[in-house]
Regions:
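Catalytic cores of nucleotide-enabled group-transfer and carboxylate-activating enzymes in metabolic
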Residues: 34, 44, 88-91, 98-100, ...
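Short beta-strand/turn micro-motifs at beta-sheet edges
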Residues: 7-10, 71-76
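Conserved beta-strand in the GNAT
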Residues: 68-71, 135
Length: 190
């Protein structure tokens, strides 16, 4: 695919951020427990089975009514059309380190941590109870309307959060407000 094919004509509206995601869950209560107890979401509303087969729970992590909704009664995984991953942005790099610590404390396996190449975000990735890949990140490159993405020669892959701090790409200044988080991460390595 050519790069110019990726830039469609201007539209009369602009998508700003992911508003919400709806996931189907085999065990709705297990999902609610994961998103509330591990990730800190709060339940905003629920639909009983009489309204939606399997029930439905709406949850939030900010002032929006819901950022994620879960529908119960999911059958065995289907082929095709599955969600690849869902990413949650945080305001500070410290929060990514805090998230990693929290995930470890909750016994959640981390599938990736460090810096991704394209986008340069520093992230921790893991799965929810049904295997949906989730990401908590900070520092995603910001691009103006006419600005090109970072050239691949500036990408700085990092396989740990600590490595991401010492090998930043041009223009990214990853600093922890709380340096103790760096030592805590080393102590908690599996």
């Amino acid at each position: 695919m050519k790069t110019d094919e990726l830039h469609p004509q201007p539209l009369p509206f602009r998508i700003r951020k992911i508003g919400h995601v709806v996931l189907r869950a085999r065990d709705l209560q297990r999902f609610v427990a994961f998103y509330t107890q591990v990730l800190g979401f709060r339940v905003s509303d629920t639909y009983p089975e009489a309204m939606v087969p399997g029930g439905m729970v709406f949850m939030r992590c900010n002032a929006d009514h819901h950022g994620i909704a879960l529908v119960g009664g999911m059958p065995a995984p289907s082929a095709g059309g599955e969600l690849h991953h869902l990413a949650f942005e945080v305001d500070t790099l410290d929060e990514v380190f805090h998230a990693r610590r929290r995930l470890r404390e909750q016994g959640v396996a981390i599938t990736f941590e460090g810096r991704r190449r394209a986008g340069a975000q520093i992230a921790v990735e893991f799965q929810d109870p049904d295997g949906h890949q989730l990401e908590i990140y900070w520092g995603l490159d910001q691009l103006g309307d006419e600005e090109a993405a970072r050239p691949s020669g500036e990408w700085r892959w990092a396989h740990t959060l600590e490595e991401a701090l010492v090998n930043p790409p041009p223009g990214q200044t990853p600093r922890l407000s709380d340096p103790a988080l760096l030592e805590a991460g080393k102590d908690a390595r599996p």
